[in-house]
Amino acid sequence: MHINDAVFLEDLCPKFRLRQWRKSIHRFTGKSCIYCGKPSESIDHVIPQSQGGLSTTENCVPACLSCNGDKSDENALYWYRRQKFYDPRRAMAIRAWLEGDLRLAIRLLQWANPNIKVKNKNYKKDESEYKAA
């Protein structure tokens, strides 16, 4: 049997691929909200879909339900600057994430919160494997 003859689960079930992509985004931050550091329970679009934001790794970040709901359809960078828990290190991490530099984003988040434990340090693999939702 050749590799071209193989059938892959993600080809048969797009929801499986989407679920794996979402899990990989949470793993990047050790399952913590990129905005406040609490446990992440959702994926937030930094640039909202209503403003043309895409469902790509660079535009989707792990967020707690509180931050995701409060931010709503606002641009994350503008919204984040007005929060009481604003941290310039996290703001730089959000900017790095948007620019596709996940390695820098994770380092900045670890600087802001040394308790973050990243399970998967292979940023390149996850970034390319789960590019779009």
What spans do the regions from the language model cover?
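Short, charged surface segments at domain edges that flank catalytic/cofactor-binding sites
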Residues: M1-K31, P88, R95-L104, L108
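Intrinsic disorder/low-complexity signal
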Residues: N4, E10, I43, K125-S128
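Short, contiguous, helix-prone interaction/anchoring segments in small proteins
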Residues: K23-F28, S32-K38, N120-N122
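Histidine-centered nuclease catalytic patch
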Residues: S32-P62, K71-Q83
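A detector for short metal-coordination/catalytic motifs
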Residues: E58-N59, G69-A133
